[in-house]
A protein has these predicted regions:
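Solvent-exposed loop and edge beta-strand segments that line ligand/cofactor-binding
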Residues: 22-35, 80-95, 108, 154-166, ...
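Extended ligand-binding clefts on enzyme/binding-domain cores
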Residues: 92, 128-132, 139, 200-267, ...
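Aromatic-rich carbohydrate-recognition surfaces in CAZymes
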Residues: 88-116, 120-225, 440-454
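C-terminal capping/lid segments that line or modulate ligand- or cofactor-binding pockets
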Residues: 150-156, 161-163, 327-349, 385-468
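Well-ordered alpha-helical scaffold segments within catalytic/enzyme domains
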Residues: 38-51, 97-110, 170-185, 264-283, ...
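Low-complexity, Ser/Thr/Pro/Gly-enriched N-terminal "stalk/linker" regions
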Residues: 20-93, 118
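Extended, well-ordered alpha-helical scaffold segments
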Residues: 58, 110-126, 185-204, 273, ...
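Bacterial Sec-dependent N-terminal signal peptides
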Residues: 1-21
Length: 468
């Protein structure tokens, strides 16, 4: 009896020490913006299986971060506005990625399902307010509203009007997955049809076959990547079937305006839209338009986006212009070249993608950095020698080798600056030198990664991580 008591006491002391070292970083229950029973149950199911205390702690902190701190669900309107984190605006890209891992849990949680449907409807609404905007205010507040010249007066609902292809891709990706999981086709109503028509019109206009179109972007700034060359139109492109993206998912201006990862993403979501239009809406004409555009862009990618590299062989360029010029790099923000195997799983086995994957994680990529704190891909948005954990997570998502997955997880656990969250970026030699302490997308993405590895039977890999 005495031995049992001592054993229990030692166990309690160990738990107390662990709690002091790894305190709960979530808001108090009454301060959480949205509560999902399914999410809480998933955390309680998975966390005890993680034997590494720091990994368990970070999973508990990160996975619910989007619903804890950024989701504003209005049950009366049925719409959901999602902050990106420390910036109180809704990016179409970020919001679609932030709530993505909750979709698989919503079939048994009606409250969660309604909130997710609200995100989708909100995104469709925002696309139709301004198809060229990347981020929006919570209402017609006129907040932010830089004195940008973009070809039209900025709507007060718009936070920023940077044309990025992925702003149209993420909402369709989310809606399609929601439908796959729930079978709820109510989101594919007249607003959906209007949204697809808007996307098609914007994509075809930005193929630049009939001139430059109505959009340009000029900003008075000391950051070269916050404005476009050639009086806001960007460098010339040859109309070869690809779609112009004036800005990257980092919100930096493109150098050559055919952004290859985003064009691949566009092909994928156009085909998803075509499936819905056929199976749900029975709209053969609109479905055919989506398929035709997808086929055209895909053919152009095969012809213009592949470059022969002296070390890695045939790889995908990051940006091209249709004239034969290409930019050989990768940026951490998704969609990136590295992330194509994550966003479009069918590409993971593509030999050109595999060559590209090796290229981007090497010194041949000007934005690959390696230092005392870790290694990974950054981008010009923050500056040189700065790594984005998003790239490390994309490497883990697309890895098949257990040692590679383990190395990625150990890096992620070592570079939280002791705070239990994933940051936007950190210096390659000092993880305490980081940007954005509250960036919900990266936090929830970390939770998504842990869940994927558990579901893929990689719990032993997670539990082999030694970082404390």
């Amino acid at each position: 009896m005495k031995k049992i008591s001592v054993s229990i006491l030692l166990g309690l002391l160990a738990l107390s020490a662990c709690a002091q070292k790894y305190p709960d970083q979530r808001p108090a229950p009454q301060d959480r913006l949205f509560v999902s029973q399914a999410v809480e149950e998933k955390i309680d199911q998975v966390a005890p299986q993680l034997t590494n205390p720091k990994l368990r702690w970070m999973f508990r902190n990160c996975f619910p971060n989007t619903i804890d701190t950024t989701v504003h669900f209005d049950e009366e309107t049925g719409l959901t506005f999602v902050y990106t984190g420390d910036i109180h605006a809704m990016w179409l890209r970020d919001s679609g990625a932030q709530v993505w891992p909750y979709v698989d849990l919503c079939k048994e949680d009606e409250h969660l399902r309604k909130m997710l449907a609200g995100v989708i409807r909100q995104q469709f609404t925002l696309i139709n307010i301004d198809p060229y905007a990347n981020a929006f205010n919570q209402g017609a507040t006129g907040d932010h509203g830089d004195a940008d010249e973009t070809g039209t007066p900025q709507d007060p609902n718009v936070w920023e009007r940077k044309w990025e292809i992925d702003s149209h891709c993420y909402p369709v990706r989310l809606a399609y997955h929601y439908w796959e999981v729930t079978g709820d086709s109510s989101i594919f109503d007249d607003l959906w049809i209007k949204t697809v028509e808007t996307i098609l019109e914007t994509f075809t206009t930005q193929q630049r076959k009939e001139g430059n179109g109505p959009y340009f972007f000029l900003r008075v700034t000391d950051r070269q990547l916050d404005t476009k060359a050639r009086v806001g139109l960007g460098h010339p492109v040859k109309p070869v079937g690809l779609i112009v993206s004036s800005f990257r998912p980092s919100d930096d201006a493109t150098q050559f305006d055919f952004l290859v990862p985003s064009n691949f993403f566009a092909v994928d979501i156009l085909r998803k839209a075509a499936t819905v239009l056929t199976e749900v809406n029975h709209n053969a004409a609109l479905s055919a338009r989506c398929t035709a555009l997808a086929n055209e862009v895909e053919a152009a990618l095969k012809k213009y986006a592949v470059v022969k590299h002296p070390e890695f062989g045939e790889i995908y360029a990051f940006e091209v212009d249709g004239f034969g010029n290409s930019y050989m790099m990768d940026d951490a923000n998704v969609p990136s070249l590295l992330s194509l195997g994550y966003l479009i799983p069918s590409m993971a086995s593509d030999p050109i993608y595999q060559n590209t994957r090796r290229f981007v994680w090497s010194n041949s990529n000007p934005y690959f950095f390696k230092g005392k704190a870790g290694e990974g891909i950054g981008g010009p948005h923050i500056g040189t020698e700065v790594i984005w954990p998003m790239s490390i997570m994309m490497k883990a998502f697309t890895a098949t080798d257990d040692a590679e997955i383990k190395a990625c997880m150990e890096q992620l656990l070592r570079t939280d600056a002791g705070l239990g969250f994933i940051h936007e970026s950190f210096h390659k030699d000092d993880a305490t030198n980081f940007t954005r302490p509250w960036f919900a997308w990266q936090n929830t993405l970390f939770g998504e990664l842990v869940l994927k590895l558990v579901n893929d039977g990689k719990l032993d890999v997670l539990n082999s991580v030694k970082v404390r």
